[in-house]
Amino acid sequence: MIDFGNFYSLIAKNHLSHWLETLPAQIANWQREQQHGLFKQWSNAVEFLPEIKPYRLDLLHSVTAESEEPLSAGQIKRIETLMRNLMPWRKGPFSLYGVNIDTEWRSDWKWDRVLPHLSDLTGRTILDVGCGSGYHMWRMIGAGAHLAVGIDPTQLFLCQFEAVRKLLGNDQRAHLLPLGIEQLPALKAFDTVFSMGVLYHRRSPLEHLWQLKDQLVNEGELVLETLVIDGDENTVLVPGDRYAQMRNVYFIPSALALKNWLKKCGFVDIRIADVSVTTTEEQRRTEWMVTESLADFLDPHDPGKTVEGYPAPKRAVLIARKP
């Protein structure tokens, strides 16, 4: 059973303590009524992982844990088998005691694009919205963050996160909660809020931006990464039934339009930090994610278009400040 008690104890002593007015009841309701049918199987995989304290831990350049003495072939096989029980692995990669989890996404490439544009993360309390397996939270800790809190309702991601945490020596500097942002009160408590790969899944993107703003302290920083298309400040793509085979894509603005949206929501010092085409080297099928990936979602005769005929995925990173 995944226990959130450590997180409750941690925030009881800091500026997130007011969250305890609602959070334990939400988590209890989730544990009682909303667990996925495979959750027990996934949580068993976490439970059966060995307790290991890493001799060498690198979160600054990667997410890598090594032991002082190499593990036996049997120990490595046990870890690999249990981690494979948590497939598909989408966000990573992770290198854990000789088990290299080659995830669908090279999330380290995204981090390398984002990191140079951030305010110094040293000592910051961070919220990562739609955090997936938690890869970027570990990189935030590696960059000096005091605490990284991730929210993502996908329960497989929670178990992946807890598995990695266990293999990192039960590190308590990062925590993942199985919630969506609409379940959070206006905490106004985070120095930096990340929303990466979420906005285009929201039916009301401006409401999402307001929700992000409600989590920030005054002068806090928003890091927003999302799909964009080329165009001026009035350009927004509203896909039909699917975009790149995804049904739940609602609005894809230009970077300039997105800048206007942020301004409308009251953000200031808004800047477009990066715009990059998503490549089939960055998102692809691997041994740890064996179903369809980006190459299957692009027009085989024109990789500049999706199979539906829309512009192929391009992503922008925007940085903004809450005044």
Swiss-Prot record:
Protein keywords: Transferase, tRNA processing
Residues bound to carboxy-S-adenosyl-L-methionine: K91, W105, K110, G130, D152, P153, T154, I181, E182, M196, Y200, R315
Disulfide bonds: none
Catalytic reactions of this protein: carboxy-S-adenosyl-L-methionine + 5-hydroxyuridine(34) in tRNA = 5-carboxymethoxyuridine(34) in tRNA + S-adenosyl-L-homocysteine + H(+)
Keyword 4Fe-4S: no
Family: Belongs to the class I-like SAM-binding methyltransferase superfamily. CmoB family.
Protein name per Swiss-Prot or TrEMBL: tRNA U34 carboxymethyltransferase
Organism: Escherichia coli (strain K12)
Gene name per UniProt: cmoB
